[in-house]
Structure formats: structure tokens, C-alpha cells
């Protein structure tokens, strides 16, 4: 069984027991999250599609911890001015494990 849900403007295809990174949330490790905007659920008996979401279906997950993406560098260069600037950014993520797909 799998589900497709929306979080932070991105769609994730998940199955129970799967681990993935979602946008950062200020939640301690060990706490639970619930995603209610489920677009589709697939099982042995077929695919259920929402219009646009499925009512009563949710994906529950537990928080494993925090992580960060690789560092990206941004460079600004002004021609003929002997001026340049280089900065970096690391995006924070929350690592979760999918526990169950409820309401199917």
C-alpha cells in the first residue's frame, strides 16, 4: 500500500516504514506528525484518487531527528568594479518515518 500526500508544496509517494526528509519543523525527535492532504492511495484492489484530496485519509509519521542538505554557494560578481561576494546556505530538514496510512 502506498499514498501520495502534499507537504510544503511538494508531493511525496510513501509506504509504511519508509524514511524521508520533509521541510523543517520545530518538533522534538520521537513526536508524531499527521499529514491530512492525501491526494491518492494505492493498494492491491486499485488506486483511489481524490478530487483534489481524499476525505478521512491521513498519513501518520514519527520524527527521527533533524538534518541538513549539502551546502550551496551563491556568488555575486560586479564587472569592472573589483567587487565580488560569495555566501553559502544549508537548508534544514526534518527526518521522518512513515508509520501508517489510516482511513483507507
From Swiss-Prot:
Molecular functions (GO terms): rRNA binding; structural constituent of ribosome
Any GO BP annotation: translation
Pfam family, one: Ribosomal_L21p
Superkingdom of the organism of origin: Bacteria
SUPFAM superfamilies: L21p-like
Family matches, as InterPro entries: bL21-like, bL21-like_sf, Ribosomal_bL21, Ribosomal_bL21_CS
A GO CC annotation given for this chain: ribosome
UniProt keyword terms in alphabetical order: Ribonucleoprotein, Ribosomal protein, RNA-binding, rRNA-binding
Signal peptide interval: none
Summary of subunit composition and partner proteins: Part of the 50S ribosomal subunit. Contacts protein L20.
Protein family according to the UniProt entry: Belongs to the bacterial ribosomal protein bL21 family.
PANTHER family, alphabetized: 50S RIBOSOMAL PROTEIN L21, LARGE RIBOSOMAL SUBUNIT PROTEIN BL21M
Function, in words: This protein binds to 23S rRNA in the presence of protein L20.
Name used for this protein in its record: Large ribosomal subunit protein bL21
UniProt source species: Rhodopirellula baltica (strain DSM 10527 / NCIMB 13988 / SH1)
Native organism taxonomy: Bacteria, Pseudomonadati, Planctomycetota, Planctomycetia, Pirellulales
Amino acid at each position: 500500500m502506498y499514498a501520495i500526500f502534499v507537504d510544503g508544496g511538494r508531493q511525496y509517494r510513501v509506504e509504511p516504514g519508509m524514511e524521508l526528509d520533509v521541510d523543517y519543523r520545530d518538533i522534538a525527535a520521537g513526536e508524531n506528525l499527521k499529514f491530512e492532504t492525501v491526494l491518492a492511495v494505492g493498494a492491491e484492489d486499485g488506486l483511489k484518487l481524490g478530487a483534489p484530496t481524499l476525505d478521512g485519509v491521513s498519513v501518520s509519521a514519527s520524527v527521527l531527528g533533524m538534518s541538513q542538505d549539502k551546502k550551496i554557494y551563491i556568488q555575486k560578481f560586479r564587472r569592472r568594479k573589483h567587487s565580488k561576494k560569495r555566501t553559502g546556505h544549508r537548508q534544514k530538514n526534518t527526518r521522518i518515518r512513515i508509520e501508517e496510512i489510516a482511513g483507507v
